Regions:
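N-terminal phosphate-binding or glycine-rich loops at protein starts, especially the Walker A/P-loop
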Residues: 1-37
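Glycine-rich phosphate/diphosphate-binding loop of Rossmann-like nucleotide-binding domains
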Residues: 8-9, 21, 25-27, 143-205, ...
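Short glycine-rich anion-binding loops that position phosphate/pyrophosphate groups of nucleotides
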Residues: 1-2, 60-61, 100-102, 110, ...
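Short glycine/serine/threonine-rich phosphate/pyrophosphate-binding segments
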Residues: 4-11, 35, 76-90, 94-108, ...
Length: 213
């Protein structure tokens, strides 16, 4: 329940989400006193939703300035660690965090691992367009991306879009400074070669930023 604005934002947002989505149950991980204080500001909502959320008290939280390595070694009682751990224990189906991104990635890899053939996770965002949407990744989980990593990102994104949108073979493209095959740098060329040869990827080629929309 951390992030830039903390429970003052996440609690009311969660309660509104519960109100609008009747099939959802939410587990809150964080400081019990702070969470309950915010919940009491919304008595009408809380009264109707009391059976659809649960609060788990956590003794610590991961700060926004904390190094991921420190979080891995010292923050096993933090709200972030316990929330991710609940996925590993199959208590919850998804985890939403507004906290330290580096720590989130490190703890997720430690607790959940990666799917077969994938070495690193990526941050993905949905971008609306005139007809449908585009998913863009990686958006900050990795500073430097090799051709192999970019190929893995394409595999992850393709699989995710297939599951979320029920599309058998979603199209995949690599964002570049031009659509020509000789544009960009060596790692982009390597990624393009791997994606083109992969039967699990419906690879279209290079695209420019304007094509995202």
């Amino acid at each position: 329940m951390g992030g830039d604005f903390g429970v003052e934002v996440t609690i009311p947002a969660s309660l509104i989400f519960l109100k609008n989505n009747s099939s959802v149950f939410i587990s809150f991980y964080g400081d019990l006193t702070q969470i309950n204080k915010q919940i009491r500001f919304y008595p009408d909502l809380t009264k109707t939703l009391i059976d659809r959320f649960e609060v788990f008290h956590c003794k610590s939280e991961v700060s926004m300035k904390e190094k991921p390595s420190f979080s891995l070694k010292n923050q096993k009682n933090s709200s972030m660690w316990r929330a991710i751990e609940s996925l590993s224990d199959e208590v919850n189906s998804a985890c939403i965090s507004t906290g330290n991104t580096g720590a989130l990635m490190a703890i997720s890899i430690s607790q959940l691992g990666c799917i077969k053939g994938i070495n690193r996770p990526a941050i993905c965002s949905k971008i609306p367009k005139l007809n449908g949407c585009t998913y863009l990744l990686d958006l900050g989980a990795n500073v430097v991306c090799s051709g192999e990593k970019l190929h893995q990102f394409a595999l992850m994104a393709s699989r995710m879009v297939s599951l979320v949108h029920h599309i058998d073979s979603p199209s995949v493209a690599i964002l570049n400074i031009g659509i020509e095959e000789n544009k960009g740098h060596e790692e982009l060329w390597k990624a393009a070669k791997l994606a083109k040869a992969d039967k699990n990827i419906n690879y279209l080629g290079f695209i420019e930023g304007s094509s995202l929309f």
